């Protein structure tokens, strides 16, 4: 389904950019003050790429990017699965019925409270992405250790739940 981009690359894009941007922008100040700046996109017109507040050259310094070739029309379905409101199973059923892959970005507590849904996401071939444990504003994290813990705690419970490493 993800013809031009591997699941691993697709998952790593948001995490890689966020990590690169925050660490790169405030690496020297991570232990003394929260990183300054925030990532965002502006959508000015329909059917045009969004405008980012970091240039392609700035992102390239950290081997990060947010957009690829826009000539090929590819749709990526992503779900911010921060909590379960009773719709995830129905969504998974519809995706399976239509043979469509998607990415579900989950927080740690979601995996804790919905292990069977997470196992099904994995079994059905969807990407399960890391959305941190508590969903904090990562640009405001005061230490590198707390920043990393938000990510590694999710990776750990995902592996305990599914038996697989998070891609």
Predicted regions and their residues:
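Sec-dependent N-terminal signal peptides of Gram-positive bacterial secreted proteins and lipoproteins
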Residues: 2-29
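Generic N-terminal simple sequence motifs
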Residues: 10, 45-46
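Generic low-complexity, intrinsically disordered sequence content enriched
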Residues: 16-22, 34, 45, 96, ...
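Ser/Thr/Pro/Gly-rich low-complexity linker/stalk segments immediately outside membranes or between
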Residues: 30-42
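Active-site beta->alpha N-cap acidic-glycine motif
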Residues: 47-142, 153-157, 162-163
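Non-membrane alpha-helical structural segments and their capping/turn regions in soluble enzymes
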Residues: 144-149
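Cyclophilin-type peptidyl-prolyl cis-trans isomerase
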Residues: 166-167
């Amino acid at each position: 389904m993800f013809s031009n981009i591997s699941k691993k690359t697709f998952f790593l894009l948001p995490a890689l950019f966020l990590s690169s941007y925050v660490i790169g922008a405030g690496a020297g100040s991570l232990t003394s003050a929260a990183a300054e700046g925030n990532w965002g996109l502006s959508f000015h017109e329909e059917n045009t790429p969004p405008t980012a507040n970091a240039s392609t050259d700035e992102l390239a310094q950290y081997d990060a990017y947010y957009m690829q070739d826009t000539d090929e029309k590819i749709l990526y379905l992503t779900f911010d699965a921060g909590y379960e409101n009773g719709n995830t199973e129905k969504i998974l059923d519809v995706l399976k019925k239509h043979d469509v892959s998607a990415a579900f970005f989950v927080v740690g507590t979601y995996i804790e409270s919905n292990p069977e849904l997470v196992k099904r996401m994995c079994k059905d071939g969807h990407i399960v992405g890391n959305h941190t444990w508590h969903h904090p504003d990562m640009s405001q994290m005061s230490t590198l250790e707390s920043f990393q813990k938000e990510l590694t705690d999710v990776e750990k419970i995902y592996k305990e739940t599914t038996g697989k490493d998070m891609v």
